[in-house]
Amino acid sequence: MKKHLIFALLAYLFIACKEPINNSSVKVSTPAELEEAIANASPGSKIVMANGVWNDLQIRFVGKGTSNNPITLKAETPGEVIIQGKSDLKFGGEHLIVDGLYFKNGYSPSFSVIEFKIDENKANNCQVTNCVIEGFNKLQRNQTDLWVLFHGRNNTLDHCYIAGKSNRGPTVRVDLDGNESIKNYHQIVNNHFGPRPPKGGASAETIQIGTSSTSMTPSHTLVANNLFEHCNGEVEIISSKANYNEFRGNVFYKSEGSLVTRHGNYCTIDGNYFIGDEDNENIGGIRIIGTGHWITNNYLLNLKGQNFRSPLAVMNGIPKSSLNRYKQVTDVVVAHNSWINCKSPLQFGVGSNLSQKDVLPASEIRSAVPIRSTVANNLIYNTIGDESPVVAHDKIEGINFKNNIINNQGTTFNTLDGLKPISFEMNSLTENIMVPSNDIQEDVFVGFEFETIDKDLFGNSRADKNAVGAVVNKDVVDSKILDKSKYGTDWYSINNTTDTKTLSMVSQNDDLASKIAEADEGSIISLEAGTYQIEKSIPIDKKITIQSKDENNKATIIYSGGAETPAFEMNPKGELTLSNLALKGEDTQYAFASLKKNMSSLYNLKVSNCEISNFDYVLKGYKLSFSEYISFVGSTLKNCENGIELSAETDDKGDYNAENVTIENCQFDNIRKNVIDYYRGGYDESTVGGTLMVSNSTFSNCGAKEDNGILLNTYGIINVDISKNTFTNNPVKLVALLWGAKNNTHSDNEIRNSGKLVVEENLKLKLMY
Amino acid sequence: MKKHLIFALLAYLFIACKEPINNSSVKVSTPAELEEAIANASPGSKIVMANGVWNDLQIRFVGKGTSNNPITLKAETPGEVIIQGKSDLKFGGEHLIVDGLYFKNGYSPSFSVIEFKIDENKANNCQVTNCVIEGFNKLQRNQTDLWVLFHGRNNTLDHCYIAGKSNRGPTVRVDLDGNESIKNYHQIVNNHFGPRPPKGGASAETIQIGTSSTSMTPSHTLVANNLFEHCNGEVEIISSKANYNEFRGNVFYKSEGSLVTRHGNYCTIDGNYFIGDEDNENIGGIRIIGTGHWITNNYLLNLKGQNFRSPLAVMNGIPKSSLNRYKQVTDVVVAHNSWINCKSPLQFGVGSNLSQKDVLPASEIRSAVPIRSTVANNLIYNTIGDESPVVAHDKIEGINFKNNIINNQGTTFNTLDGLKPISFEMNSLTENIMVPSNDIQEDVFVGFEFETIDKDLFGNSRADKNAVGAVVNKDVVDSKILDKSKYGTDWYSINNTTDTKTLSMVSQNDDLASKIAEADEGSIISLEAGTYQIEKSIPIDKKITIQSKDENNKATIIYSGGAETPAFEMNPKGELTLSNLALKGEDTQYAFASLKKNMSSLYNLKVSNCEISNFDYVLKGYKLSFSEYISFVGSTLKNCENGIELSAETDDKGDYNAENVTIENCQFDNIRKNVIDYYRGGYDESTVGGTLMVSNSTFSNCGAKEDNGILLNTYGIINVDISKNTFTNNPVKLVALLWGAKNNTHSDNEIRNSGKLVVEENLKLKLMY
């Protein structure tokens, strides 16, 4: 044995000595020093960036480390090296590690914040770890970039926190164009993807792997053990567009979208958690397009989305689809998943649209139903019975349903061979995890290669005692999936804006504009009764509430600024609540408007119990501006030339200017044009956005000068509900023209001398693809 | 050591004993015995079929052998077990071997002759070896079958001889529909694929792997070390339609077609031989569609095909192509191949058809040029200089040309970066193999993963001394690629019909019909001068020549059979040469016609120095009949209602009735309709067939009753040449309407009082897909 040891040691030394190791550590404090250190680095080098703010820094990390001796670029103290301004980081070489940097207060001057390529020099075996990218948005939402852009092979993004992207482009993208970037085995693991607000249009995925044009490539990207929290950018949280990607052990927490196999085939979706919210229909699950995907051991809780956003959406394809549209689903396996308290969790033939053949070309008709697919050994549990746990939007003969079980609390549903109602109970292991209280005795179907499903959700072996559903063993320990210390960096703690609001009293003697400018994030400005004259637009770039001190004796704000300027100028990140006030113009101004450009983030606006009058526009959203929430509640809007205009996105590429618009208990009187004008253009079945609720409101003497003759213009908006309103003496042709095929509804409206409310089933829109 | 040995022996015995071995051999002589033996078989069983003819036998070989102890079904003597009549063979199970059977004189009653599946029971690890399938055709060419149909995984077809398929359907097909049949690693190795005649339309590949609808699947089929000899069925000899297939070491000998990566990606085409013929433009090479294929170490000699049939055709794709059309070429590597005496061997953007945008929909326009592809380290050698060794049908900026060399004997050509004219010599190693006489000193380009090209054409290592071209070492030994003992069975020898012709003298006293019926294959019937009266159609089902004994004193045959019956009835395999005769009808009969149905094989007809008169039709080809060669030389056709009609395929699916039609030195006089009527319908860019040559002939007083007003109607025929003819006093609108975009030409014709000869560039045809 001794001899062997000596030989092994000698061998080790021999191998080790072949490679010149550099264990030196060099600290750099300026860009020039950093550049020099990179140029001088050799395997084993450590470059330490000094704490502090690095402004306008473009790191070009070129080098060649080795597997045992990588070259490392790290923060002196993780999180205390701030990269801001026009900055980015690009890798070119092998075995390079970046550790502990913090990107904030800036944006990339290039197409990416972090990229695994410099010109044609693609990175391999490189790593970004323990870093943060936060709100590093380009100035306008139509300026595209990626925050992390993969090329090459075997690169890793791990233990990072990434949040707040609002401009166009997926947060993370894997590029596959070129043989150097296929079979990449990249790893995106243990990250925390924090909130991404809705973009109001396409191209806002959190992760996109490939594009349709490279969807034939073998990718083998692993996305595992990440937390996706409120990733609401668009309908796809993850868009897999290549072959052999794997999605394992991720937690999708209240994220408005789905994990979608959009293009490409043979992906594995195993052991993920999808956690919804009782009231949120935007939170989806898994949406399947294409061939050979295996969806196993997933746990889906409280998901209420439908159709494209169903807990499981197995789509119809377009026969012989072109490369960038919808491939037929074939050879898919959905096995050993659990759906707990989801609404109609299993939906097949989603996107079936034969009924739209008159408004769409044949190449857009999804009539190819799923075939040669197996749905087996799944478990559905409902605390309250579901009348349609399985929804067939088209024929489902191509699907082999085997040994699925449901506890539907006795509620009847359309029976289906292979879905058996049985009685079993579930225990809450934690708030979000329910596991069967007893071993479920139902037989397990053994399909082709089902022996490869050898572990359950918790990684326990299925060999000895297999069971239907995602969990085999009732005696499991809490895996703490929402413990945020398991994801992201070891230093960043999410900045929870305190809800303790500073209250600032303002009287007529004060300068209201200054008070607002000086106020802290989240402040409340409380106005004494009286009249406040404003002569210049007040910029709103933070969260702020302006209200009357005494709601029974409202203050009045009179705006006398320039024509076509707003009293309140909504800046990026501006969140204004206006409450119990009167706001008056002089007929030529706007009450509220976004910036005309550089809306790098969204704004929100809430108006309650106010009276707004004598403006040219009540609200004008300029092109490229976006608001997640706009609401007018209990307010009066009167004597204005225009009302609420959110219709500046006229390119018909699916973009729109606001996600949620709510009008409740309001009175609109003598609003002459664009009473409500809310627009989304471009045919894209997967867009699920734009929401307008108009209820319990009255509209009178409005629309006299409206060119298109429609009082509430909602063209192309997907979700519209108009109910319990009264329309009196509005000289228009139509109160509204609703889109029947989408989620457009109306009820209990009283219409007198105001035109008709018409529903058109299939709206003709411009094709986007 | 002794202990170890004992232990190993014990272990072996233990493992061996776990599996019940059956070394028994059972001989069977009847279908019932065979069925019983199969039912009783266990691992190791050998079932021996008795020599003799087995008629109408449907073998269902179900069983479960093991890797070490397969179940074998073998001929008592290989080749002496004849399977004939309505017979087929299907496998269902594991580790089953069939050895030595001979399928002939029959056809499959099912969709396949040999199939690796019985109902839903797919075969795995099964083998067909040392068998022959010969002329086992269904009765009509539109009746589809496959002769070997793969399903499941790890099945093998080896050392078989397979020839003579003329009905619709690839000879061998691999099916990939269903997860059980993907990643199949089937092996098609060491076979001899003998002649397959042209089918006259699509679906006559020798091997097809998958279909477009399963083209996203990983297939991994290996096609290696096979000989393809005169595989002329259609434009594709091998049609690869799935991913990761490998084509290695095959010999394509004078086969009219190409190896095509029609759908699917990442195939390997390595070390194959493509051997052409000086004068045959139908013999192609390698045609590339799709992504990521590697074409390396191939040797291509004497190939004269162009465009779709070029020695290397890299195609243009359709942007965002639908699943069944043409994908763009991307990420392809063409390296270390040798083209010797090929015409314009490297063609890029093949199929570019923007010029046809007026007659084709956008979804048929191939405008997507090859991108991200590398063409490097290839060698071109021309004994006679080639002015265009590289043809760019569209832009070639997407291709990286590196370190390619050409010896063009000083002939200038369009220069191209990356193709260097240098001087080097080649030696003939054998008739068909030329290797460099000296080591070529040119630098080798090292592209991405080029280190995987570690061997050359002959399997010699490239590690020590790499070189441009397919061969690294000048000192190589003949690998005898055309030694037929290397391919196919160990018992079958190809039946070369002797060219020693029996001469049979016939006088007016003899019964001509009986003499013809009795004649051997290849006989010559020589007629004394005089008149021969025939009252019934004479069937021609073999190779036979009928001629006058004295060409200066021609015999006359008068046919007085029923109206609309032919003097000579062309049966399957009928090959008639008629020479120096007069053939006369009584106005209502046909001189020649095919069978009306059951044309299970083609017929050929050659008429020289004859006078044919007073028929309703000279030649009538019925629907589903097909002739490879029809020629009229030095003959007179006169006073007939119709001439030569080969236009029965009116379904517009690309089929046609004859491959080669030649009219030379003939006189057509008073042929009133369908003077020549030759038709192919259906738009399919890859169809290259139908050939009509009309030269040095005269046409007078013809076409008076022709409805369409065209004398020589060649609608849809790809190759037409009309030259040096004289057209006089033919009352038609057009002599011919030629298709300019195809290979239709005319020259030196004299046209008097006979309408015009018009060329239309883009013919409007029915879309087939």
Predicted stretch roles:
Chain A
Residues 22-29, 51-113, 133-137, 507-510, ...:
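Right-handed parallel beta-helix/beta-spiral solenoid domain characteristic of secreted/periplasmic
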Residues 45-49, 404-406, 465-470, 523-527, ...:
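Extracellular beta-strand repeat scaffolds in secreted/surface proteins
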Residues 60-69, 118, 476-487, 540-546, ...:
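Short, compositionally biased
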